[in-house]
Curated annotation (Swiss-Prot):
It is an enzyme of class 2 (transferase). The lineage of its organism: Eukaryota, Fungi, Dikarya, Ascomycota, Saccharomycotina. ADP binds at G212, G236, F341. Keywords: Acetylation, ATP-binding, Cytoplasm, Glycolysis, Isopeptide bond, Kinase, Magnesium, Metal-binding, Mitochondrion, Nucleotide-binding, Phosphoprotein, Transferase, Ubl conjugation. Its cofactor is Mg(2+). The gene is PGK1. This is Phosphoglycerate kinase. It comes from the Eukaryota. GO terms for biological process: gluconeogenesis; glycolytic process.
Amino acid sequence: MSLSSKLSVQDLDLKDKRVFIRVDFNVPLDGKKITSNQRIVAALPTIKYVLEHHPRYVVLASHLGRPNGERNEKYSLAPVAKELQSLLGKDVTFLNDCVGPEVEAAVKASAPGSVILLENLRYHIEEEGSRKVDGQKVKASKEDVQKFRHELSSLADVYINDAFGTAHRAHSSMVGFDLPQRAAGFLLEKELKYFGKALENPTRPFLAILGGAKVADKIQLIDNLLDKVDSIIIGGGMAFTFKKVLENTEIGDSIFDKAGAEIVPKLMEKAKAKGVEVVLPVDFIIADAFSADANTKTVTDKEGIPAGWQGLDNGPESRKLFAATVAKAKTIVWNGPPGVFEFEKFAAGTKALLDEVVKSSAAGNTVIIGGGDTATVAKKYGVTDKISHVSTGGGASLELLEGKELPGVAFLSEKK
């Protein structure tokens, strides 16, 4: 599946069409108050573009939180409708459900050019296909799922997906539309453009930077990237498993992943066969407890980490080594911070690496930050707009980097 050959919103004739946009309005709420409207703001370019092309109406649909297939006011999209209305400077009609005769009647009766936001898709078990009852998974019937998908499809002539964060889920609103044209919105298109370039046609040298605690969780990721990259930096907690297995470094009480340890030699063998340079930290900031105010010191890998101490960040020599590796690269994909950046004492390694990739991006290289923790780092230090691309989807970007096909992307029409 090529990521760069999918139909775009710009390929569509939208005049007088009934347009359905699957957006990602899964915003953080404090009661009924939205604490960050970033996801709503991110969807505006696609919504505005569609409105400028005079559709019959625009129907927006999203999930919010995990209501587990039933109505729960806590997860209502009503506050989002208000926020969207003020951001768009245009009336937004909020409907109390996402399917059913009342929804169909309200949509049909809407004025030309209306913007309609449906209630949370996940109030219906048919969106995800199952729900948890007393810890057990209960599946929706095939007939009910088909009916739900048919009801959503019947609201539209054209389907646009702009929810990259959910693209790795084969949910009804992602793969259930029986419509001839299924296109990517601007947000999704940008994700596909950057990941497509890196994974299908990178400017070399291509560097992957990986963090995270467990090797076992990242096996598929490392294995797939070894087929594509020229070098790989391994930081974070999983570096200790590599150091212990490969160099017999004393790692004290640092994270050691037994299951992952068995795979390390295989991964290194593959790296060697493919000519991929694997860069590991050579010194550590260690702590006598996993806490923000622990005692700290710096040790080299030769000295090792004493019992009762654990590594929570890479040290100054590692930072220099990583900086030199970043400086050589023309394409960089970063997934996972190298240290416990949430604690100020152990954030320096992450901050130093961030400074280097910002520099690389400023020099015109392609730098992609996978969603999740690494995106949080970019946001924390206010550099999101100084990086070529910060992904909006943690799980979805990880699955792309693992070489998996995303159902929500595979479902889109191909460009003619």
